[in-house]
Curated annotation (Swiss-Prot):
Descriptive protein name: Enolase
Keyword entries, A-Z: Cytoplasm, Glycolysis, Lyase, Magnesium, Metal-binding, Secreted
Binding site for (2R)-2-phosphoglycerate: Q167, K343, R372, S373, K394
Record-listed Mg(2+) binding positions: D246, E291, D318
InterPro entries, per the entry: Enolase, Enolase-like_C_sf, Enolase-like_N, Enolase_C, Enolase_CS, Enolase_N
Pathway(s) served: Carbohydrate degradation; glycolysis; pyruvate from D-glyceraldehyde 3-phosphate: step 4/5
Cofactor(s) in the UniProt record: Mg(2+)
Organism: Edwardsiella ictaluri (strain 93-146)
NCBIfam families linked: eno (TIGR01060)
Catalytic activity: (2R)-2-phosphoglycerate = phosphoenolpyruvate + H2O
One annotated Gene Ontology cellular component of this protein: cell surface
Length: 433
């Protein structure tokens, strides 16, 4: 019943109007899985390769027909006839056929779309929801939790056309008792933030991830605006709602000078100075998580940052680790950061994603499941977060269907699982137990 009989790849459009790969995997019993690959803007240099056509006459060179041809041709040929329930085998076959270190022959966008579509088809064949199938693949059947959302309500950096250098200012509705309540709190703060920004004569257009993208005089001003919005919504900052930031520091690191340049503020810092700049913000505001607080290659700086702040708050590696077990293993050995951001298109298959989550958890690191800035209506990351009991999710703000699709799927899953999927709030965040 779970033998693969047909594989289809197609070019669809993502939330930024760029093409991406969608795949369908059809099984013997008439079961079908469909999934689409997301795409990042601030990408780590060691991510698996997203294959683009480079043909300037189509989609400004961003077409994905080569990746789609790989799905419809060589990938389909090798996995047709195989058992979709054996996810590790399906992924391994594709990885071996690609034969490159970073999936550059077929593209991680091709391999991932098929990998996820295969998992969805297998779940359908087993007559179970995707999160339940993922929990079985993860070796943790029936073990679920609802993730604490990190909601990106002010966008800067590569995600917005403004003067704010830090890429994401996020809220975590830690006072909520359920995921559904967390979404409500997030929505109320989001709408109150619009009022706060409007009252200051600021723009309330949204960035790629659905957060506002105003011009602000400093990063601290973004935090101050959020604090005002939280209070305006009737919540207590630090008790009901905590803060998180994604610096995406590689984007403002000057490799020539070795300095971190906050152009919006007209300031530049050495590596250790930037750590202390961030530490200063954490003393002023209840920031419990900082992602990519330094450049991905600044491992000495990260070791120092972890020493200074790692005992008190969650330090998440995104560009730093790129969901790659080899790099994560080295980071764990060297005591770099204490959490990993999980983006399955950074590594390019479900099996490798599950391996990264397991490695992190075994080492006492937390794992934060994440969207990309280029998304589709595909909500697989919601099932991934619940099925691995990862505990935290980053999937944007309270606007744009490409973001909200994930929250809505989490609401459905929570309704289905009830007490079997507890919402643990702040307890999920490293250093906040």
């Amino acid at each position: 019943m779970s033998k693969i009989v047909k594989v289809i790849g197609r070019e669809i459009i993502d939330s930024r109007g760029n093409p991406t790969v969608e795949a369908e995997v059809h099984l013997e019993g008439g079961f079908v899985g469909m999934a689409a690959a997301p795409s990042g803007a601030s990408t780590g240099s060691r991510e698996a390769l997203e294959l683009r056509d480079g043909d300037k006459s189509r989609f400004l060179g961003k077409g994905v027909l080569k990746a789609v041809s790989a799905v419809n041709g060589p990938i389909a040929e090798v996995i047709i006839g195989k058992d979709a329930k054996d996810q590790a085998n399906i992924d391994q076959i594709m990885i071996e056929l690609d034969g490159t270190e970073n999936k550059s022959k077929f593209g991680a966008n091709a391999i991932l779309a098929v990998s996820l579509a295969n998992a969805k088809a297998a779940a359908a064949a087993k007559g179970m929801p995707l999160y339940a199938h993922i929990a079985e693949l993860n070796g943790t059947p029936g073990k679920y939790s609802m993730p604490l959302p990190m909601m990106n309500i002010i966008n800067g950096g590569e995600h917005a056309d403004n003067n704010v250098d830090i890429q994401e200012f996020m809220i975590q509705p830690v006072g909520a008792k359920t995921l559904k309540e967390a979404v409500r709190i997030g929505s109320e703060v989001f709408h109150n933030l619009a009022k706060v920004l409007k009252s200051k004569g600021m723009n309330t257009a949204v960035g790629d991830e659905g957060g506002y993208a105003p011009n602000l005089e400093s990063n601290a001003a973004a935090l101050a605006a959020i604090k005002e919005a939280v209070e305006k919504a009737g919540y207590v900052l630090g008790k009901d709602v905590t803060l998180a930031m994604d610096c995406a520091a590689s984007e403002f690191y000057n490799k020539e000078t070795g300095m971190y340049e906050l152009k919006g503020e007209g300031k530049s810092f050495t590596s250790n100075e930037f750590t202390h700049y961030l530490e200063g913000l954490t003393k002023e505001y209840p920031i419990v998580s900082i992602e990519d607080g330094l450049d991905e290659s600044d491992w000495d700086g990260f070791a120092y940052q972890t020493k200074v702040m790692g005992g008190k708050l969650q330090l998440v590696g995104d560009d730093l680790f790129v969901t790659n077990t080899k790099i994560l293993k080295e980071g764990i050995e060297k005591g770099i950061a204490n959490s990993i951001l999980i983006k399955f298109n950074q590594i390019g298959s479900l099996t490798e994603t599950l391996a990264a989550i397991k490695m992190a958890k075994d080492a006492g690191y937390t794992a934060v499941i994440s969207h990309r800035s280029g998304e589709t209506e595909d909500a697989t990351i919601a099932d991934l977060a619940v099925g691995t009991a990862a505990g935290q999710i980053k999937t944007g703000s309270m606007s744009r269907s490409d973001r909200v699709a994930k929250y809505n799927q989490l609401i459905r899953i929570e309704e289905a699982l009830g007490a079997a999927a507890p919402f643990n709030g702040l307890k999920e965040v490293k250093g906040q137990h």
